[in-house]
Swiss-Prot record:
Primary location: periplasm
Keyword entries, A-Z: Electron transport, Oxidoreductase, Periplasm, Signal, Transport
Family per record: Belongs to the aromatic amine dehydrogenase heavy chain family.
Record lineage: Bacteria, Pseudomonadati, Pseudomonadota, Betaproteobacteria, Nitrosomonadales
Native organism: Methylophilus methylotrophus (Bacterium W3A1)
Name of the protein: Methylamine dehydrogenase heavy chain
Gene3D superfamilies for the chain: YVTN repeat-like/Quinoprotein amine dehydrogenase
C-alpha cells in the first residue's frame, strides 16, 4: 500500500455556516492543487493527458504485393481472427473477426477478402449458421454477407477446401455433410446458387472459364465444368501418384498461372499445370538427397510449400524428424528450382515455424508464422536474412495468405 503524508489527507473538524462553507471550498481547492503536485512520478504523462473529443477509425493503404494476412483459428476455438499486416514493415494494419475454422481467400487484385464462416446460436452449440463475408481490405468493413447452406467442411483450417474463381466472380466451397458437394456462390449477385454434386474428392483448384479440379482418393484429379446455374460436367485425369505416396494437407496452387505443387510426407513434390483443356503433369522432384533421407530430413508444418512464379523457385519447410510427425513445425526452408529440382539454397529460420509463404514481387520476402511464438517472421527470400517480425498474434496463428498477383 502507498500512503501520502499530505495535510489535505488529514481529517479536519467540519466547518459550519457560510464562513465554514467558504473555508471548506478553499480547502478543497488547495487540496486539489496540492494533490496535482503530488502525482506519483511513475504514472508519467498518461494521468494528465487530455481526452480526445472525437475518435476515428484509420483506413489501411491499398493492398500490394507484400500485404500479408495471418489466420489465428485459436486451435479449434469458436471464434478466429484474421490479422492484416504490412509485410514490408511488419506493422499491424487491422483485424477481422471470423467464426470457427474459417476459409480465408484473397481476391486476385487484393481489394477484398472472402471469409467462409460457421457460428452457432449458443456459441459452441445450438443452431448452426454458415455464411460468407466479403471484407474490404482498406476499411476492414463487410461489403457483403451471404447465407450459405450449413455443411462446410470443418475438420481443420485447410487452404484449398474453398476458393475464388480465377476472375473473382464466383466462390466455391467444399461441403462434407450430408454428402460430398461443392457450393457455388455468385459474388456479383451476392447470392448462393447451388450445391453441386461431386464424388468423394477433396481440395478445389479453379481454372479459367468456370472449371475447377479436385483431388480424388484413387490418386487422380477430377475436372469439373459448371454453368451459372450450377450444372456440371466432369472428367477424370490419369492417376498421378501411388496410394502410399501420401500427400501433405495443404498444397500450393496459383489461381493466376494454375500451377499446382504438392509435396509428399517424404519430400517428393508432384506438380501439374491445370487448364480448361485438362491437366499436364510434370516430372516429380525429390528435394532431399539419399543421405538427407537417411538422416531423416522430411517436410513438416501446416503450409509447408510455397512457389515464386517469376523465379520458378519452390520453397519447402522441413526439418530432421521421425515418420508421421509431418504436422509438427520445422526450422529450415529448402529452395529448389521447380523444373530441374536443383538445390539453390537452404534457409535456417531459427524458430519453430508452422507455415510459410513467399511474396510474388521481384524482391521477394519469405514469411514464416510460428504458433509457439505467436509471431510472423519476415526474411529476404533470396539471401535468407532475417528482416523483421511482429508478435502477439492471438492464440495460435497458423496460416498465411497473400495476393496471388
Amino acid at each position: 500500500m502507498t500512503t501520502f503524508d499530505h495535510p489535505s489527507m488529514i481529517r479536519q473538524p467540519k466547518p459550519t455556516g457560510l464562513a465554514g462553507g467558504l473555508v471548506l471550498a478553499a480547502l478543497m481547492l488547495s487540496s486539489s492543487l496540492a494533490l496535482a503536485d503530488a502525482t506519483p512520478n511513475q504514472l508519467g504523462s498518461e494521468i494528465t493527458a487530455k481526452l480526445q473529443d472525437e475518435t476515428s477509425i484509420a483506413i489501411a493503404p491499398a493492398s500490394d504485393s507484400k500485404r500479408v494476412y495471418v489466420l489465428d483459428p485459436g486451435n479449434f476455438h469458436m471464434t478466429s481472427t484474421v490479422y492484416t499486416i504490412d509485410g514490408k514493415s511488419s506493422k499491424l494494419l487491422g483485424m477481422t473477426d471470423a467464426g470457427k475454422l474459417p476459409n480465408v481467400m484473397v481476391a486476385s487484385d487484393g481489394k477484398f477478402l472472402a471469409i467462409a464462416n460457421t457460428m452457432y446460436s449458443r456459441v459452441a452449440r445450438g443452431k448452426r449458421d454458415d455464411y460468407l463475408e466479403l471484407i474490404d481490405t482498406k476499411t476492414h468493413q463487410p461489403i457483403a454477407d451471404i447465407d450459405i447452406p450449413e455443411g462446410r467442411f470443418l475438420t481443420g483450417v485447410f487452404e484449398r477446401t474453398a476458393g475464388l474463381s480465377v476472375d473473382d466472380k464466383h466462390l466455391l466451397f467444399q461441403q462434407f455433410s450430408p454428402s460430398p458437394g461443392v457450393g457455388l456462390v455468385d459474388l456479383q449477385q451476392k447470392a448462393f446458387v447451388k450445391i453441386m454434386n461431386v464424388p468423394d474428392c477433396y481440395h478445389i483448384f479453379p481454372t479459367a472459364n468456370q472449371n475447377f479440379f479436385m483431388h480424388c482418393r484413387d490418386g487422380s484429379l477430377m475436372q469439373f465444368t459448371y454453368d451459372s446455374k450450377g450444372n456440371t460436367k466432369q472428367k477424370p485425369t490419369k492417376i498421378f501418384h501411388a496410394e502410399k505416396e501420401y500427400l501433405l494437407n495443404n498444397p500450393y496452387y496459383s489461381n493466376s498461372n494454375n500451377h499446382l505443387t504438392w509435396p509428399t510426407y517424404e519430400g517428393k513434390i508432384f506438380q501439374a499445370k491445370l487448364s480448361e483443356s485438362g491437366a499436364e503433369f510434370l516430372k516429380p522432384i525429390e528435394v532431399f538427397t539419399d543421405k538427407e533421407k537417411a538422416d531423416k530430413w522430411r517436410p513438416g508444418g501446416w503450409q509447408t510449400i510455397a512457389f515464386h512464379k517469376a523465379r520458378n523457385e519452390l520453397y519447402l519447410l522441413a526439418d530432421q524428424r521421425e515418420k508421421w510427425t509431418h504436422k509438427l513445425p520445422s526450422r529450415f526452408v529448402f529452395v529448389v528450382d521447380a523444373t530441374s529440382g536443383k538445390r539453390l539454397r537452404r534457409i535456417e529460420l531459427k524458430h519453430e515455424i508452422n507455415s510459410i509463404a513467399v511474396s510474388q514481387d521481384d524482391k521477394p520476402y519469405l514469411y514464416a508464422v510460428s504458433e509457439e511464438a505467436k509471431t510472423l517472421f519476415t526474411f529476404d527470400a533470396v539471401n535468407g536474412k532475417a528482416l523483421s517480425s511482429i508478435d502477439e498474434l492471438g492464440r495460435a496463428p497458423s496460416m498465411i495468405f497473400i495476393a496471388d498477383k
